[in-house]
Structures are given as C-alpha cells and as structure tokens.
UniProtKB/Swiss-Prot annotation:
<keyword id="KW-0031">Aminopeptidase</keyword>
<feature type="active site">
    <location>
        <position position="266"/>
    </location>
</feature>
<feature type="active site">
    <location>
        <position position="340"/>
    </location>
</feature>
<keyword id="KW-0963">Cytoplasm</keyword>
<feature type="binding site">
    <location>
        <position position="259"/>
    </location>
    <ligand>
        <name>Mn(2+) 2</name>
    </ligand>
</feature>
<dbReference type="InterPro" id="IPR043472">
    <property type="entry name" value="Macro_dom-like"/>
</dbReference>
<feature type="binding site">
    <location>
        <position position="277"/>
    </location>
    <ligand>
        <name>Mn(2+) 2</name>
    </ligand>
</feature>
<feature type="binding site">
    <location>
        <position position="338"/>
    </location>
    <ligand>
        <name>Mn(2+) 2</name>
    </ligand>
</feature>
<dbReference type="GO" id="GO:0030145">
    <property type="term" value="F:manganese ion binding"/>
</dbReference>
<keyword id="KW-0479">Metal-binding</keyword>
<dbReference type="InterPro" id="IPR008283">
    <property type="entry name" value="Peptidase_M17_N"/>
</dbReference>
<dbReference type="GO" id="GO:0006508">
    <property type="term" value="P:proteolysis"/>
</dbReference>
<feature type="binding site">
    <location>
        <position position="336"/>
    </location>
    <ligand>
        <name>Mn(2+) 1</name>
    </ligand>
</feature>
<comment type="similarity">
    <text>Belongs to the peptidase M17 family.</text>
</comment>
<dbReference type="InterPro" id="IPR000819">
    <property type="entry name" value="Peptidase_M17_C"/>
</dbReference>
<keyword id="KW-0645">Protease</keyword>
<feature type="binding site">
    <location>
        <position position="338"/>
    </location>
    <ligand>
        <name>Mn(2+) 1</name>
    </ligand>
</feature>
C-alpha cells in the first residue's frame, strides 16, 4: 500500500476523485464553511446522525458536489493522536473489506495537523490494512492500493508523514518475522533477516555461530541452545549514522524462536504462541529497518541472541549450574526461565561498545502480563533519566510503558547455596525478580529492560504480532540525536574470575 501527502483544504478536497473520502471531525469543528463537505458535516452533527466522539462513523454515497464515491465522517473528539488512531482504525477496518482501492484521509477539518496527528493516521491505516501472507498458499489480494493524507499545510505535516512511513516499514518488518511459524523463523533464518538489512545504508551485520560464542565464554546462552538441533546465532547489527567517537545506544532483543519451556515444559494449550518469544528480536530488526529510512545522526548497536528452547537429550536440567560470560555462575531452577539466560550474556557482550545506554527488549514473564495486561509494557531501569526518556517516548508514540520497581529486596529470592545466583525466585513479583536477575549483569552502564510479554502479540481471533515496541524505540532513539556525545571511559565491569563454561554445545 502506497501513501501520499497532499495539500487538500476542505474546499479543494470536494473535487478529489477517490473510492472513499475519510474526513476526521473534531468536537470543535469550525462552522461556516460554504463547501459541500463542511455543509454535510455541520448538518450531520446538528441532526445528531454523527457524534464527534472517537470511533463514531457516518457514511454517505454519491453526495452532490463531492467527487468521492463514498464519504465517511469520523469523530475524533479532541483530535488527540490517540483519538485519531481510534477513528482511522474504525473507518479503515470497514473500508478495506469492500472494493475500495484509493482512499483520501482528510485532516483538514482539524486546522493544522501536527506531525503526531499525521503519524497516528498513517500508522492506523497501515495497521488496518496489514495481512500476513508468507506461509499461505492462496492469498486474497488487498484491494486497497493507495492512501492520500490530505492536510492544510504541507510544511507542518511533512515531518510526521516521513517519520510515519519509516515507522510503518519498521513495524511491518517486525510483524513479518514475529508472525512466521518457528520452522520459518529459525535462528539461522533470523540471521538472514538481519543480513537483508545490511543491504541498506549505514547498516552492518555480523553473525556469530556456536564456535564463536563458545570462544567468548557465553556459557549461559549456550546452555539454553544445547537441547535443540537448530544451531544458535548471535546477531550483531550496527547502524552508523554518526562519527565513531559518538557512543552508541545498544538494543538487545530476546531471540528465542520457539520456547517449549525445555525440561520444565509448558502446557500444550496455546503453546503455538511461543513462536512469538522472539518478538524482542523482531522489534530490534524493525527498529533498524526504520533507522535505515530516516538516517538519524546517531549510532545504534543491536544484539540478538537467537536460539530455540527445546527438551532434547542434551537439554539443560533443573539443578544444573552454568557459567555466564561475566564469570558469574547461575543455578537453573526452571528451564522455562531461559530468556534471562540468553540476555545476561548479551548484556556482558554490550560492555565492549562503551554504550551511552543499553535497552533490552524481551517477552520475559507471564507475571508482567498479569500486572499490566496488554496495554503497557513493563519498564525497569537503573537510571532515572533513561527511564524517563523511554516512558516519554512511549507516550508520544502511543506505545506506552509503565515503570516498575527494582528494589534490592527483590533480589533476596535469587539467592542459592549452589551458585552465585538462581535463575528464578518465587512466584510473587516474578516480573521484578526477573529484572533483578538481569540487573546483576548491567552494572557498568545506564540500562533499561522492557518486558513486552503482554504487548508483543494478541491472541484470539486477532492473533498476531503487534510490532510493539518499535514505535517506542524509534521515538526514544530519535530523541537521543541531539544528546549524542563522544564515548567516555566506562568503569571496568565487576565480575568474578571467569572459568570454563559448564555447558557445552555442538559446533
């Protein structure tokens, strides 16, 4: 589907030929326009046939004086970005099912459409029209081919429009890989997706296999992978949009391409959804796809530890002790708490980049779903400035998160008699204790953890990946462009003396 930004005031839009004209109507709509469209909106509001509330719709066909075949008036209340998204989603869900090929979305009734409004409208159109088709033998063609965003001032709307197009590409790239079945998105294939991104400007990719990972001493990551015949991959992406002296932001995405739980096996019900356990990795890939479009002046590193978690004959067992890349030993009390085991080695690896900040993204805990549901992602951080920046980015991008506690008392449950740390505590506060485990490996840099277990995908009839938190991550990164600073010497990471990893893996 193609998008176009066009100067179309209300008076001019009446002569715009299209299959459907979607006009967003705010609650403070100015009266007095003498064009047919303004007259139609005023009459509908006065008669009570239309309410200027988000999601309220009124359709009219072959309206005199209007060239569009169909006119849809959609209320947007106070015209906030959130309300615009709600209105466009409602209207486009209806329009995409007909023979509509060209839609004009008019923001002209809202006076000057700010960039955030334009972005919300474009992203909502994309979400409504998205259809996964990669593994289907027969696909009904999407009839909707073009969406024109009509505004009063191009100069005001252009920044939001350009950003929205990049964001749409990032979200759809993330959705594509998250939605693929596990046998179509193995660690090797995921590495191929990263290599695909390396064709784009300023992106470089390096892929490490089992031998390289073993040489690095990533015993925790290797332990998770030893139960599967699919070889692990450690994917390193670099977006280099600034000078080498500029310290990068590091994004780490959990890449468990299928999670059975291992020996601590999950129940069979809805286990198919465990293909979504790599949504953190998919969000990193999607963010890099968007960065390639926008070319911001900053440096970003993406790290993806990719593996399956399977109950094979060599699989990790409850009670095993493994040695992480940091040298810390970990007792495995539950093999279904594998995400933190791959992330902890990635956090240690991130130290070599002397990062400005590190953000890990993971479908980590069911406890976070219980706490926050599917509305907000869980945010944990050891740095207030970083946490505030991420939270603000979540609000502005309509991809919200909620900061959770990281009190030291939560780490008490991770104590064990047999290693430096256990990989799980009790059930209480499970999202927090998981974050406290990761916190141990992030002591030398500003760090944040986004638990997206409740927001990365939807179940039921609308089952599929959401593409979150690509919008949040992109907004955060773009906000860091002016804050870019040369690398500073980082304090040496405190770690125990490294010993040979307990767990081994196939080459």
């Amino acid at each position: 589907m193609d998008f176009e930004l066009k100067l179309l005031p209300l008076a001019r839009i009446c002569s715009e030929k299209c299959d459907a004209l979607l006009v967003l109507i705010p609650q403070d709509l100015s009266a007095g326009g003498d064009d047919p469209l303004s007259a139609l909106a005023a009459l509908a509001l006065k008669a009570g046939d239309l309410e200027a509330k988000p999601g309220k719709l009124l359709s009219a066909y072959r309206t005199p004086g209007i060239a569009a075949t169909r006119v849809v008036l959609a209320g947007v209340g106070d015209a906030s970005p959130r309300n615009v998204r709600t209105a466009v989603n409602a209207a486009m869900a209806n329009l995409k099912n007909g023979n509509t090929q060209r839609v004009v979305v008019s923001l002209a009734a809202m006076n000057n459409a700010q960039p955030e409004i334009v972005r919300a409208a474009v992203v909502a159109c994309s979400e409504a029209a998205y259809v996964y088709s990669t593994t289907k033998s027969k696909v009904s063609p999407v009839k909707l081919q073009r969406v024109v965003i009509g505004v009063n001032e191009l100069s005001v709307a252009r920044p939001g429009f350009d950003k929205a197009l990049a964001l749409v590409k990032g979200i759809e790239f993330a959705k594509e890989w998250a939605n693929r079945p596990a046998n179509h998105a193995t660690p090797t294939l995921l590495a191929g997706a990263a290599r695909e991104l390396a064709r784009l400007r300023n992106i470089k990719v390096e892929v490490l296999g089992p031998k390289e990972v073993a040489k690095l001493g990533m015993g925790s990551f290797m332990a998770v992978a030893q139960g599967t015949s699919e070889p692990l991959r450690f994917i390193v992406l670099r977006y280099e949009g600034a000078a080498k002296s500029v310290a990068p932001v590091v994004l780490i995405g959990k890449g468990i391409t299928f999670d059975t739980g291992g020996i601590s096996i999950k129940p069979a019900a809805e286990m198919d959804e465990m293909k979504f356990d790599m949504c953190g990795a998919a969000s990193v890939l999607g963010t890099f796809r968007a960065l390639a479009e926008l070319q911001p002046a900053l440096n970003v590193v993406g790290l993806i530890p990719a593996s399956e978690n399977m109950p094979g004959g060599r699989a990790l067992k409850p009670g095993d002790v493994v040695t992480s890349m940091s040298g810390q030993t970990i007792e495995i009390l539950n093999t279904d708490a594998e995400g933190r085991l791959v992330l902890c080695d990635a956090l240690t690896y991130a130290e070599r980049f002397k990062p400005r900040a590190v953000v890990d993204i993971a479908t980590l805990t069911g406890a976070c779903v219980i706490a926050l549901g599917g509305v907000r992602s869980g945010l944990f951080s050891n740095n207030d400035e970083l946490a505030q920046s991420l939270a603000a980015a979540g609000e502005s991008s309509l991809d919200p998160c909620w900061r959770m506690p990281l009190d030291d008392d939560y780490a008490e449950g991770l104590k064990t008699n047999f290693a430096d740390v256990a990989n799980v505590a009790g059930r209480a506060g499970g999202a927090v204790t998981a974050a406290k485990f990761l916190h141990r490996f992030a002591g030398s840099f500003p760090w944040a953890h986004l638990d997206i277990a409740g927001t990365a995908w939807k179940g039921g009839a609308a089952k599929g990946a959401t593409g979150r938190p690509v919008p949040l991550l992109l907004d955060y990164l773009l906000g860091q462009v002016t804050a870019a600073a040369p690398r500073k010497a980082q304090p040496k990471a405190r770690s125990a003396k490294r010993s040979k990893p307990v767990s081994r893996t196939r080459a």
